[in-house]
Regions:
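Extracytoplasmic/periplasmic
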Residues: 37-109, 118-123, 158-191
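Short, hydrophobic beta-strand segments
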Residues: 28-30, 47-57, 97-109, 143-163, ...
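Signature of alpha-helical transmembrane segments and their immediate interfacial
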Residues: 1-39, 151, 527-535
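Solvent-exposed, membrane-proximal periplasmic/extracellular interface segments of envelope transport
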Residues: 26, 62-144, 199-220, 228, ...
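Transmembrane helices with small-residue packing motifs
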Residues: 21-58, 110-112, 145-148, 458-470
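Extracytoplasmic/periplasmic membrane-proximal domains and adjacent transmembrane bundles
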Residues: 169-348, 352, 357-360, 388, ...
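Alpha-helical membrane-interface segments at transmembrane helix boundaries
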Residues: 2-13, 37, 41, 72, ...
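Hydrophobic transmembrane alpha-helices and their membrane-interface caps
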Residues: 354-439, 444-463, 489, 493, ...
């Protein structure tokens, strides 16, 4: 069969290359029309998750503890939840955090998938009033533990930033796929400001520092001494403050402050207590004020795909000129990684081209050798289309860089054999035909051994010799599926097409060279004859 195909390839090389190109374009079209998107890093089955309990507003310690206990009780009885560690209190990083429950799952082969289990957890805690629940799965690989979608809104005016934030959140709520949406808007609440009239205070001989000391008596207290008990080497700090029942705003107004002439004057003479809206933490990015939105993505959906939908939704929204919207998170990571690995791929291709040019001393044969890389990309996208997997920016790109160094070996062998037959006196068609037949078995066997070695990783197989069993889909094997699939798919596709396309390209190269040479000779003869006649 291969003899017949090879004969057609060398006798009709242009038709053969056209059909090969059509097949590659078809694989590209099939993949991109399926809109499978891209993926920054493989989704590894997590072994644990953190349930974050968030609540806006001031809650007492007992109310916070009650929310955490209710959350822990709701998820403890779910099948697949092994151990829970509950903690009440903020962590200093997450805004509005009341507490958290760290959940360790059962073994992956004894429960449903983590995505289904986390969905059950969301359903079990949705009845909790006054709380917003975020469930964050353990994340492997680069990208940190943050949410994959992050939108940064920067500007100079908080009112404009808040309006833009509300508009974008409304758009996100309408798009199916965004979950656990949160932002960095300050929690609603009041804060009391003590406005001191410095002129009146100075008239009574009262300093701002002394006023601050008196106010501390009603808040955290004033340090008056240090005390070291006999049974310890560490000193204890002694603070003085009012009893709990006296620590209130009314008492603050009645607080008497000593003056320079020995009198005690109410604090209200020097200061006015005014309520104001709580401002919260002011975040900045590159000197501009920042509002941010973060979100998780539903299982089975890709963050870049949802971000593109959101971008199209907000294209028609007119924001003030001072407001800038930037998509960070996984979208930013993908762009940076693509740029870095893309440069690495180009650099490796340039190095290989230089080595091949020195080896073959022929630009055309170097181009033919490097064409195997283009052929391999068709196999990569065809396999991704058939398996309905997104293109992995990290692992698939690394696989492509590794594949580039593997697939050119077949062409090097074919072209080297082709040149050997040429030196023996065969013409281009005969040399290309005989090179294909001679090297068919070595090329196929080399490719098969490589592909078979990758099969366990492609199908996520884990062979446990001590247990005498084979596991499918273990978390440890999920790391390498994209990398191995890229190499195996590209090598399979490129190997068979190389055995057809390379002989055809070698014939086309010779034909093209003769055609160009004949045209140049004819043109020169015409000019010379014209000059002779005119003379």
């Amino acid at each position: 069969l291969y003899k017949d195909i090879l004969k057609i390839s060398v006798t009709r090389p242009i038709l053969s290359i056209f059909l090969v190109g059509l097949l590659i374009v078809g694989s590209y079209t099939a993949y991109f029309s399926a809109k499978l998107g891209v993926q920054f890093f493989p989704d590894i089955e997590p072994e644990q998750a953190v349930v974050q309990i968030l609540s806006r507003g001031d809650l007492s310690a007992s109310e916070k503890n009650s929310l955490v206990k209710d959350t822990e009780a709701s998820i403890s009885n779910l099948n697949g939840v092994d151990i829970n560690f509950a903690k009440t209190g903020a962590d200093g990083r997450t805004k509005d955090l009341v507490g958290s429950v760290r959940t360790i799952f059962s073994d992956w082969d004894e429960r449903e998938t983590a995505a289904d289990l986390m969905e059950s957890m969301r359903g079990s805690v949705k009845f909790l009033e006054g709380a917003n629940i975020n469930i964050v799965a353990q994340k492997e690989g680069p990208g940190g533990q943050g949410k994959p979608v992050r939108i940064e809104i920067t500007g100079t005016d908080f009112d404009q930033l808040n309006k833009a934030l509300f508009v974008i959140r409304q758009k996100m709520n309408k798009i199916d796929g965004f979950i656990d949406i949160s932002d960095n808007l300050p929690s609603p609440g009041l804060e009391w400001n003590l406005n001191i009239d410095r002129e009146i205070a100075a008239r009574h001989g009262v300093t701002v520092a002394s006023l601050g000391t008196m106010v501390k008596l009603l808040t955290k207290g004033v340090k008056v001494s240090d005390y070291r008990p006999d049974d310890t080497d560490e000193e204890l700090e002694v603070f003085l403050r009012y009893i709990k029942s006296e620590r209130n705003l009314d008492r603050l107004q009645e607080l008497r402050v000593p003056t320079s002439d020995g009198r005690y004057v109410p604090l209200s003479v020097f200061a006015e207590l005014t309520p104001e809206k709580k401002g919260g933490t002011i975040s900045r990015l590159d000197g501009n004020r920042l509002r941010s939105i973060e979100a998780n993505v539903k299982e089975g959906m890709q963050a870049p795909f949802l971000i593109e939908k959101l971008k199209s939704e907000i294209e028609n929204v007119t924001f003030p000129k001072s407001v800038s919207v930037n998509f960070a998170g996984e979208d930013e990571d993908i762009k940076e990684t693509q740029a870095f690995l893309g440069q690495s791929l180009v650099f490796s291709l340039v190095l290989m081209s230089i080595v091949l040019m020195i080896q073959f001393n022929s630009a055309w044969q170097t181009i033919v050798t490097m064409s195997a890389i283009i052929l391999s990309t068709g196999g990569i996208f065809l396999l991704l289309f058939l398996t309905e997997r997104p293109f992995g920016v990290v692992m698939s790109m690394l696989g492509l860089i590794a594949l580039a160094g593997i697939v050119v070996n077949n062409n090097i062998v074919l072209i080297d054999t082709f040149n050997e037959y040429k030196r023996k006196g065969h013409n281009h068609r005969e040399a290309a035909y005989m090179a294909g037949l001679t090297r068919f078995r070595p090329v196929i066997l080399t490719a098969i051994t490589t592909i078979l070695g990758l099969v366990p990783m492609v199908f996520s197989l884990t062979i446990r010799f001590s247990e005498r069993d084979i596991l499918v889909g273990a978390p440890s094997s999920q790391w390498w599926v994209d990398l191995s699939s890229t190499i195996a798919g590209g090598l399979t596709f490129a190997t068979f097409l190389t055995l057809i396309a390379t002989p055809a390209l070698l014939v086309i190269g010779r034909t093209s060279v003769f055609s160009i040479k004949n045209k140049l000779v004819t043109l020169l003869k015409t000019k010379l004859s014209t000059k002779t006649v005119s003379t």
